């Protein structure tokens, strides 16, 4: 049995991986689209397919980060890298209650540190223009619409996790790529509604660093990205448990 300390370190690293590459890709896309980076030949493809093309690219960045994290760290901590997933697994007794808070703390710290390091790499415009990839409802999207989108998106993610990673009958070795592609698809679908967080930690890291370094306060939206994902994950876990019970 891997110690709790080692598992929490793995969760920290995995969530760092997710936010640095995923939210970082979102920030860079915004920076390039708004002229926040110097023109160069490598920028030419950005926006070539319009907004949808950018969401596909961002979704794939998240998807590859998740897949890599699962394959690298899954055997250590289970690679939740998401407080909603941790709570969802706990709700169906697939994760011990005593480890829930340490896991969530590790995930939040990993996300915050990832945003901080990305800011140091990309410069202050990553926060002032790119928002460090922070999520927020898009214009015309109401608070409850956004929460519903996050709930549905996380439900789909969690039902996939239950089927491909938690269920012992699932084929081995496919969890990383299937979960990663699922996240990429969900981001492409609801990205232009909520920014598609599906993960309280993924939103927490950019919010904290945006507030500290850019003076941007988005915390009024934070409940969307906590309540929506947690409700979606718990409902999915309970639904899967019901569907597979004898």
UniProtKB/Swiss-Prot annotation:
Give ranges for the Cytoplasmic compartment: 1-11, 67-69, 125-145, 194-217
Report how it sits in the membrane: Multi-pass membrane protein
A single GO molecular function, which one?
water channel activity
Could you confirm whether the keyword DNA-binding appears in this record? no
State the similarity comment.
Answer: Belongs to the MIP/aquaporin (TC 1.A.8) family.
The subcellular localization recorded is: Cell membrane
Name the Pfam families on file. MIP
Motif location (NPA 2)?
199-201
Instruction: Describe its function.
Output: Channel that permits osmotically driven movement of water in both directions. It mediates rapid entry or exit of water in response to abrupt changes in osmolarity. Also exhibits a transient but reproducible increase in the initial glycerol flux.
The text the record gives for the protein's domains is: Aquaporins contain two tandem repeats each containing three membrane-spanning domains and a pore-forming loop with the signature motif Asn-Pro-Ala (NPA).
**Annotated GO CC locations:** plasma membrane
What is the designated name of this protein?
Aquaporin AqpM
PANTHER family (UniProt xref)? AQUAPORIN TRANSPORTER, MIP17260P
Q: Where is this motif: NPA 1?
A: 82-84
Task: Give residue spans on the Extracellular membrane side.
Answer: 33-45, 91-103, 167-172, 239-246
Name the gene behind this protein: aqpM
TM segment ranges: 12-32, 46-66, 70-90, 104-124, 146-166, 173-193, 218-238
Please, which domain of life does this record's source organism belong to? Archaea
Give the record's subunit note.
Homotetramer.
Which UniProt keywords are present, listed alphabetically? Cell membrane, Membrane, Repeat, Transmembrane, Transmembrane helix, Transport
């Amino acid at each position: 049995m891997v110690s709790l300390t080692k598992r929490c370190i793995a969760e920290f690293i995995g969530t760092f991986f997710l936010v640095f590459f995923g939210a970082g890709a979102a920030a860079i896309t915004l920076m390039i689209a708004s002229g926040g980076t110097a023109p160069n030949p490598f920028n030419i493809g950005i926006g070539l397919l319009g907004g949808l093309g950018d969401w596909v690219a961002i979704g794939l960045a998240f998807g590859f980060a998740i897949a890599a994290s699962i394959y690298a760290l899954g055997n250590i901590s289970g690679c939740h890298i998401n407080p909603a997933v941790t709570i969802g697994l706990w709700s169906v007794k697939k994760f011990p209650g005593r480890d829930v808070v340490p896991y969530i703390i590790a995930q939040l710290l990993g996300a915050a540190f990832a945003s901080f390091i990305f800011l140091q790499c990309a410069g202050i415009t990553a926060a002032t223009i790119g928002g460090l990839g922070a999520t927020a409802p898009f214009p015309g999207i109401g608070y409850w619409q956004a929460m519903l989108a996050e709930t549905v998106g996380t439900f789909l993610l969690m039902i996939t996790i239950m089927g491909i990673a938690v269920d012992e009958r699932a084929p081995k070795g496919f969890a990383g790529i299937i979960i990663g592609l699922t996240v990429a698809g969900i981001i492409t679908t609801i990205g232009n509604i909520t920014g598609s967080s599906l993960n309280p930690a993924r939103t927490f890291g950019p919010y904290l660093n945006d507030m500290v370094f850019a003076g941007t306060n988005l915390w009024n939206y934070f409940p969307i990205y906590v309540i929506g994902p947690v409700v979606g994950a718990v409902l999915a876990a309970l639904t899967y448990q019901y569907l597979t019970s004898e």
